[in-house]
Amino acid sequence: MDVFQTIILGIIEGITEFLPISSTGHLIVASNWLSIEQNETNKAIEVIIQLAAILAVIANYRDKFTLKHKVLWSKVVLAFIPIGAIGLLFHKEIKTLFTVPMVGTMFIVGGIVFLVLEHFYQERSSHVQEVEAISYRQALWIGIAQVFALIPGTSRAGASIVGALLMGLSRKASAEFSFLLALPVLAAAAGFDLLTHYSDFSRGDMLTLSVGFITSFLIAYLTIRVFIGFLQRFTFVSFGIYRIAFGALLLWLG
């Protein structure tokens, strides 16, 4: 993977990781279109790009990393358990699902889910407005919903946001809890890949790794801030439409 390809993947990861449009799906498609060989060294570079996205969440929500928020983080850990357990048990089977037809199909399915949900969803004052107010029951159900993200093209952010909306969270609170929930999920995935591809990091070009990391971090940091501002004025309908259109394009191109 050269520097240009790494920049492209860093931009894609930074934009799509925290939006409900599947970062994995976009990275699979981009890798195919850029003819990036799926060798162990390139997989290691993708891990570095994901780690940068984790740091972007920490940078945006650094005020949450205090002892007074320990209850919030216990709920985040609870929500992580379902996807962590199932992902660990079935990671080999899940890898076989990483195909363009599967990604395209799940893009469309996810888009339809968002359109249907937004048709019935109305913001109410009774909805949870701040992530600190989420109950353990709500956190668990959001975590269960996130399990669907193990299917490529579903979107981790999308699955967790849908679960949060169904559990009575506001759009803003749904997105913010999804951001925080990304930390253990991405850390676990990156940690697993680090263990399996550890030796490949020594073969990776440090310039390429650094450029990918910085690009992903900066884009992810800005995306999080813009996305929260967007949700204070708009709905998820545009994401539903995009998912259906992009999924149809993928299936058409084959």
UniProtKB/Swiss-Prot annotation:
EC number assigned by the record: 3.6.1.27
InterPro entries assigned to the protein according to its UniProt record, in alphabetical order: UppP
GO molecular function: undecaprenyl-diphosphatase activity
Membrane-spanning segments: 1-21, 41-61, 71-91, 97-117, 147-167, 175-195, 211-231, 234-254
Disulfides per UniProt: none
GO biological process: cell wall organization; peptidoglycan biosynthetic process; regulation of cell shape; response to antibiotic
Predominant location category: membrane
Enzyme class of the recorded protein, top EC level: hydrolase
Membrane topology (UniProt): Multi-pass membrane protein
Keyword Cell division recorded: no
GO cellular component: plasma membrane
Catalytic activity: di-trans,octa-cis-undecaprenyl diphosphate + H2O = di-trans,octa-cis-undecaprenyl phosphate + phosphate + H(+)
Domain of life per record: Bacteria
Keyword Membrane in record: yes
Alphabetical UniProt keywords: Antibiotic resistance, Cell inner membrane, Cell membrane, Cell shape, Cell wall biogenesis/degradation, Hydrolase, Membrane, Peptidoglycan synthesis, Transmembrane, Transmembrane helix
Protein family: Belongs to the UppP family.
General function of this protein: Catalyzes the dephosphorylation of undecaprenyl diphosphate (UPP). Confers resistance to bacitracin.
NCBIfam families: PRK00281.1-4
Other notes: Bacitracin is thought to be involved in the inhibition of peptidoglycan synthesis by sequestering undecaprenyl diphosphate, thereby reducing the pool of lipid carrier available.
Name of this protein: Undecaprenyl-diphosphatase
Taxonomic source organism: Desulfotalea psychrophila (strain LSv54 / DSM 12343)
